[in-house]
Swiss-Prot record:
This is Small ribosomal subunit protein uS14B. One of its GO terms (biological process) is translation. Part of the 30S ribosomal subunit. Contacts proteins S3 and S10. The gene is rpsZ. Pfam families: Ribosomal_S14. The keyword RNA-binding applies. Disulfide bonds: none annotated. Binds 1 zinc ion per subunit. Binds 16S rRNA, required for the assembly of 30S particles and may also be responsible for determining the conformation of the 16S rRNA at the A site. The keyword Ribosomal protein applies. One of its GO terms (cellular component) is cytoplasm.
Length: 61
């Protein structure tokens, strides 16, 4: 319940622009947000493994 209210709160335009923070649009996670992909690291990893994110490959050496 608290997570849903935080997601709704993050979608609203804040009173001051510095109060705005990034949140994953898929799962609502506030931490480990990657601006380049606009999602959290966990969602990015899941989508990259399924091949839904172009240009991302699993590294191996």
């Amino acid at each position: 319940m608290a997570k849903l209210s935080k997601i709704a709160q993050a979608k609203r335009k804040p009173k001051f622009s510095v109060r705005q923070y990034n949140r994953c649009p898929l799962c609502g996670r506030p931490r480990a947000f990657l601006r380049k992909f606009k999602m959290c690291r966990i969602c990015l990893r899941n989508r990259a493994l399924r091949g839904e994110v172009t240009g991302v490959t699993k590294s191996s050496w």
